[in-house]
């Protein structure tokens, strides 16, 4: 079992520093869930009730969240997104990385170094699909020594059982039978949080 107290301490120091800088510059910070209620108003629901903020202009920097697919049991603690993977609570013996992008490969590299057996499934014909094919070709040759790469393959079903996460796939490199994994990292992209703010109002 891994302890994340040091990481949490660093995060607390960084966020505390930012809060201090904001206070020093007389920036008012309102914590809570905000939604636009009009062209020049925002309502924030926090622990102490609702606060209405009036403004002339607004900068939306709401970040993003991982894409979730309906057939994946995301509520199971063995099904991870990138934030879960960074918690490093345990090192799975066998880890499936869904998505051959930067985040998935980076996390796969970390867990391989810690001792995990890594499978990577990517629906396109190369990892990091947006990158230059010549560069990716060299990179793929290198990581193929560490990972079991399944290109032109996609996940069709994910089932959580007591002894593991069972994953069915189809495509060029798909195994004929469902595969059992100790954990599955879903790294298939992210979507912006802007829609949650009712910015259209």
Features from the language model and the residues they span:
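Redox-cofactor binding/interface segments in oxidoreductases and associated redox assembly factors
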Residues: 5, 60-61, 97, 186-187
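Glycine-rich active-site/cofactor-binding loop and its immediate structural neighborhood
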Residues: 38-68, 87
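Glycine-rich dinucleotide-binding loop and its adjacent helix/turn
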Residues: 62-116, 121, 149, 200-201
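Conserved acidic residues
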Residues: 56, 93, 182
